[in-house]
Amino acid sequence: SKCFSPGTFCGIKPGLCCSVRCFSLFCISFE
């Protein structure tokens, strides 16, 4: 399954961000 890159909208499926977290509906990096 594909995962989302930083900056990708994740409001619908917040658990699919690649090595990033969902914040304010967008994937962001931990750095």
From Swiss-Prot:
GO annotations of cellular component type: extracellular region
Domain comment (free text): The presence of a 'disulfide through disulfide knot' structurally defines this protein as a knottin.
Protein name: Delta-conotoxin NgVIA
Keyword field: Disulfide bond, Hydroxylation, Ion channel impairing toxin, Knottin, Neurotoxin, Secreted, Toxin, Voltage-gated sodium channel impairing toxin
Compartments, as annotated in UniProt: Secreted
General function of this protein: Delta-conotoxins bind to site 6 of voltage-gated sodium channels (Nav) and inhibit the inactivation process. Potent paralytic toxin in vertebrate and invertebrate systems. Its binding appears to be voltage-dependent.
Tissues/organs with expression: Expressed by the venom duct.
Record organism: Conus nigropunctatus (Black-spot cone)
Family: Belongs to the conotoxin O1 superfamily.
Annotated positions of the 4-hydroxyproline modification: 6, 14
Transmembrane portions of the chain: none
Listed GO MF terms: sodium channel inhibitor activity; toxin activity
Main location: secreted
Disulfide linkage: 3-18, 10-22, 17-27
